[in-house]
Amino acid sequence: MMFNLKSRKNRRGFTLVELLVVVLILATLMAVALPLYLSSVADSSKKTCRANMQSIANAAQAWKVKNRAADFTTMTISALTPDLGAVPSCPDGGAYSIATTGSVNDESGASTAIPTGSLGISCNKAGHNGFIPGVMTK
């Protein structure tokens, strides 16, 4: 059986080497793009969590005015539902809590004391930290 060289030249398609080069290029792009994408997703979750804490802080201020309260000691998160509609949930599954004493960890992990008459809002999801309105601006 003889192979006809003329019929081989007329065939169309990709060689194995060409396909391997394409696969190698795609793998390289994925190796660069995937970590950047995952980092962006994690960063957006933290920013959403922070925005939720800001919404809770705004609702707490509204509660304080409506109830003519001197401070936040008698307030609970569930008391904020008239202003929030529903208590926001952390996009990564964490739960929010409000404290009027103690401290809250900021984005660097440093502990910041909650000033008298103020409140601190925390998310129990690791890496999401907390927020004190008027103290923590980032």
For the regions a protein language model found, what residue spans apply to each?
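Alpha-helical hydrophobic helix detector
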Residues: 20-36
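Extracellular/periplasmic head regions of type IV pilus-like filament subunits
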Residues: 58-61, 65-126, 137-138
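Aliphatic-rich helix starts adjacent to a transmembrane/signal segment
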Residues: 36-53
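Secretory/exported precursors with cleavable N-terminal leaders
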Residues: 13-14, 19-21
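N-terminal leader/signal peptides at the extreme start of proteins
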Residues: 1-14
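Pore domain of cation channels
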Residues: 132-136
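Histidine-centered active-site/metal-ligand motif
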Residues: 49, 126-129
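Conserved catalytic core of two-component sensor histidine kinases
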Residues: 23, 50, 57
